[in-house]
UniProtKB/Swiss-Prot annotation:
Protein name: Peptide methionine sulfoxide reductase MsrA
Pfam families xrefs: PMSR (PF01625)
Keywords from the UniProt entry: Oxidoreductase
GO MF annotation: an example: peptide-methionine (S)-S-oxide reductase activity
Family statement: Belongs to the MsrA Met sulfoxide reductase family.
Active site residues according to the UniProt entry: 10
Length: 169
């Protein structure tokens, strides 16, 4: 099994696309990239801990590759917005691909270069590619949020889904 960590704005919206893929064993919402051990949601939202909301994905590389996950990641984000994603603003919502080893870093860098060269976006691809740091699991009420709160999830993800349809479909 392997691990991937992606930050793409609100973690509620990043779970379902990955959970639907064959070879995914788990997708958990959490916080990473900051300087406070085991932060709470309230601390992360205060924008004082340095953390981003992210998802940790455990996957079977014999069924789905890390490269496939990176491609799916791009299609869930606006890679031209470094200051948050959609209606969620600030460093805690910035887009980041966190790599766990050199191979993941190389795959992510090549994929980013390929996306930039594709001309899909008029602006530069600004998603960061950074080494993985400790991943702290978010509170239980954040786990599987789209399943527990479908109406609130639909409302909170509407702007994202509109962008994705316009730019990735």
């Amino acid at each position: 099994m392997e691990r991937a960590i992606f930050a793409g704005g609100c973690f509620w919206c990043m779970v379902q696309p990955f959970e639907e893929q064959a070879g995914i064993l788990s997708v958990r919402s959490g916080y990473t990239g900051g300087h406070v051990p085991n932060p709470s949601y309230e601390q992360v939202c205060s924008k004082t801990t340095g953390h981003t909301e992210a998802v940790e994905i455990i996957f079977d590389p014999s069924l789905i590759s890390y490269s496939d996950l990176v491609e799916l990641y791009w299609a869930q984000t606006d890679p031209t917005d470094a200051f948050g994603q959609f209606e969620d603003r600030g460093d805690n919502y910035r887009p980041v691909i966190y790599y766990t080893d050199e191979r993941q870093r190389e795959i992510a860098e090549r994929s980013k270069q390929s996306l930039q060269a594709s001309g899909r976006f008029d602006q530069p691809i600004v998603t960061s590619i950074e080494p993985a740091e400790p991943f702290y699991l978010a509170e239980d009420y954040h786990q599987g949020f789209y399943q527990k709160n479908p109406q609130r999830y639909a409302q909170s993800s509407a702007i994202r889904h509109q962008f994705l349809e316009e730019h990735w479909q």
